[in-house]
Amino acid sequence: MNWMKKRWAVLVASVVTNICIGTGFAWSVYQTGLFNESVSVFGTEVSQAQLALAFTICSGVAPIPMIAGSGLQKTLRGPRNVVWLGGILFSAGLIATIFIHSLSMLYVAYGLLAGFGIAFAYGITIGNTVKFFPDKSGLIAGISTAAYGAGSIIFPPIMQALISRYGVMPTFRILGIAYGVVIIISAWFITAPPEGWLPDGFTPKTGGKAAAGPGQADKNWKQMLADVRFYLMILVFIIFATGGLMVVSQGSPMSQAIGGADAATAAVIVSVIAVGNTGG
């Protein structure tokens, strides 16, 4: 097999997968639809805050499968099967949402099922793809991550158009099936490089300081946890991520409540917000 060509197929498949699962950032479009149809869906009115908790759970569980995903590659015999698992869970979470009658069911369907699916797929598409491109690791990680953000640029207007025409629950079903099919097909092209494989003409840096950077040394995970700088870094990440996720996940109801936008315009605003998220 020509692995120099294969790696580009892996990159494209990973980008397509991340675009699909990245629509999780467009939750606010679903949330607005659920809020408007809350009486028919839940049998009573619910608040925006109660609905927003589904996205909070979806994002909050993400670290668990991301950490477990690397170990699952051995259990499931490769990254392709982990992405398949992620795609099936993500699709199942969206489709299961059409059967909900309570907020707790929403939290399980979208928050847990879809959340675990997103994280399983995302953790593999980034880490595995970078293995194919040690010569361009920063660029490739950026492209793969940007694709995750791009999902919430492309799909919000489509989501809102479907909600306006069919309602929010059929939209969950339509998109759940569509995403599942696309991810399963894309995952077929995702594989891991052979052990020790390197691109033609690439020679990796060797030695502790050369690999880690001038004046620095590599740390194992135990040493990392013992370093106070690790916790400061985590705190900075949490602060920045919290602000960003608040805006990204509530773009639609915020623009309607504060700016007086209609649902279609609010969906476009969500896409515009996602442009900044993707660019970053």
What annotation goes with each model-predicted range?
Residues 34, 111, 118-133, 137-141, ...:
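Intracellular juxtamembrane helix-capping segments at the cytosolic ends
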Residues 53-72, 271-280:
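Central cavity-lining transmembrane alpha-helices of secondary-active solute carriers
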Residues 64-104:
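Conserved MFS/SLC helix-loop-helix module at the cytosolic interface between two early adjacent transmembrane helices
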Residues 27-34, 140, 220-280:
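Extracytoplasmic gate region of multi-pass secondary transporters
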Residues 19, 93, 104-120, 238:
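Hydrophobic core of transmembrane alpha-helices in multi-pass small-molecule transporters
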Residues 39, 77, 99-101, 134, ...:
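Helix-breaking motifs and short loop linkers at transmembrane-helix boundaries and internal kinks
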